[in-house]
Amino acid sequence: ISELPDDRYLFRYYTHDPWWANSPWLDRYGREAHDIYLPMAVTRIDADGNVKLPTHLTFLTIDDSYGNMPEQVPSEVIPHILQGRRTSPDQPGLIVWVYPFDEYHDWAYKQPERIEEIYYGDWFIQQAINDGFPMNTVVSSGNFTKLMEEGKNTFDESILVSIVPDAGSEMEKQLMKFVENGGKLFVYGPSSHASKEFLDFLNIKTVEPISGEMKMKLRLKSDRIKVPGSDILKHNADMSGGGIETVVNNSADPGTKVLAQAFLGNQKRDVVVQRQEKEWNGGMVTYLRGTNSATYRGGHLLTPDDPDKWFNGSSLLRYSLDNMGYSIHFDKLKAGLKNPINCISRCDNAFYFSGFTPNQTIEQQWLFPQGAPIFTGYETELRNGMAHYRMPKSYQEECRVFVKQDEGVVSCYEVAPVEWNVKRRIGINGLKQATVRIYPGADDTHFEVVNNVGYPYNKPSLERKKGTDYAGTYYEFENITGELIAIW
């Protein structure tokens, strides 16, 4: 959906099957709505920088394999569809994929030797999403370049994810400009076609590529796994766009950190390299070589490598978010348990966390630069400042509150608005000398917050201090203990 002939595209949901004897809503999905909320949290950015949602909705099908039309299915599915649409993205999400649409087309026709890079690139991102990397927005490389050339601020509140751009391309220029102006960028994939200028920007150089079974060394916070998996990465050059050919160029550069390395015998390659310069106004770029941790074993699709036996190369993308201030980690019993899949989208100034939890024994741990996310209607235990959640099988949860507090149980909940000129009230409790950041609705004209006041909440509002350090429109309140009621 990054490039379309016009603005039309389709969302189709699988309720019944007219050929095979199954009704997916009832059996395959088990009446869980993850395949509604996750795709409906996804959006594209057009050439004008606008968010574009699906224009058409279809169902396959309204009748089951026997021609029956049980009322239960539409009665249960339609509310989820309406909720998903009501909270669909209205701005780019936390993470935006700059999809190389034109580049892939040109490689296929003019540089067929690079087709393996196309195959690798899509598989690597697919695996990262399945690992829990919370990306929800896509823009084509052509539209990205156009918007940047026009000076649009479309991506100012997002982290970008891109392939290594071709030498001398306009995309190369605009990606560097984005970082130098304070943006955060992930670059992944083979670097052999990059310019010297871009390699210097990343502070890497290319050497002899290696592939095979390599021992990994991480300087990244990773998931907590009771029975750890392997630290051996299987990098198949055929499935990963070639071998691993990158090392740091200038190891004395104080702005460069090597976050992950791969070792094959006495050969070492730097597979995750982060760089940041003072002149970049907080900008940061992280290069990941990226491994497609999957093997062809016959059939239509690759088979993911067993995490109990092999290191999952796609996990490095999520782990590297930690160094950009976004900590998303899982606590699980063993490596082979499937990770939760997450999307983080934005609507009406809120953050929406949509997801699927294949195994509910897994605990999710979250921390953003602005604090621990406190979902509306949830309680969470804060440990070392991080929010800990055991999520349901499928979910779409609103987050308007972030709390900086080391320990404790914090909750966020709806409070009846009661008054005629109040749209909404939410409460936040369990605070202990906390810094609280609240994202009210887009219309915050009458926003106010009271501390430790019961109904009718007529105590004067705390001083409203609009924050500027982080994404979005939010208000910051410091040294708060007890309960806050936010009103707008």
Indicate where each model-derived feature is located.
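Helical hinge/lid and interdomain linker segments adjacent to catalytic or ligand-binding clefts
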Residues: 115-205, 360-361
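Short, Gly/Ser/Thr-enriched beta-strand-loop segments that form substrate-interacting elements
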Residues: 254-272
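Exposed, low-structure sequence patches enriched in small/polar residues
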Residues: 99, 217-222, 244-249, 272-276, ...
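Aromatic-Pro/Gly-enriched surface loop or interdomain linker
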Residues: 44-50, 63-155, 348
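Short acidic, S/G/P-rich loop/turn micro-motifs used as interaction or catalytic elements
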Residues: 16-20, 63-68, 101-109, 164-171, ...
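Catalytic-core regions of glycoside hydrolase
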Residues: 1-63, 129-134, 141, 161-167
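Extracellular ligand-binding/catalytic regions of CAZymes and related secreted enzymes
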Residues: 27-94, 266-488
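A glycine-rich, often tryptophan-bearing local segment used as a flexible ligand/cofactor-contacting loop or short
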Residues: 170-247
